[in-house]
Amino acid sequence: MGFDPVTFAKIKKISIDSNADGYIDYANQAGNADKLDGKDASDFLSIDSFKDLKEDNGYIKFPTGLIMQWGKVYVNNTTSYQEIPVNFTIEFPNKCLNVFASIYEGSGVDNDYIKCITRIANITTKGCVVCITDISGASGDVGFFWFAIGY
């Protein structure tokens, strides 16, 4: 189904002449859609309204109040079970909604590993506890990444 200028003109009640002045006039009457509410689109969101720290342990604060944080924790212990405290980069003003963690195995000795992240506990606005099992190696090049979201 294509565009039919005659049907469009009848629906919009504009006149058509041979050089399409009617379409141009209709477009001019519509005005700047960006200013319909009196504001530019750029008034709603500026790059300055985002706050962030782009580091291994960092965060981004969105203008809506949503905060995403991330970090990396190294583990130097060879115990079979460990509860590792995680301190968020910044405190969430209201609530931490969720925390995710994933295993990190760096370039250390081949037998350095963490077998499993069993759970994430004690989630607060300031941090949480990540529980890991079957830790092997003490080179300091194993651990986990964490990611938290809140407001």
UniProtKB/Swiss-Prot annotation:
Q: Which Pfam families match?
A: Gp53-like_C
Instruction: Cite the InterPro entries for this sequence.
Output: Gp53-like_C
Q: Look up the domain of life of the source.
A: Archaea
User: What is this protein called in UniProt?
Assistant: Uncharacterized protein MJ0347
Please name the source species. Methanocaldococcus jannaschii (strain ATCC 43067 / DSM 2661 / JAL-1 / JCM 10045 / NBRC 100440) (Methanococcus jannaschii)
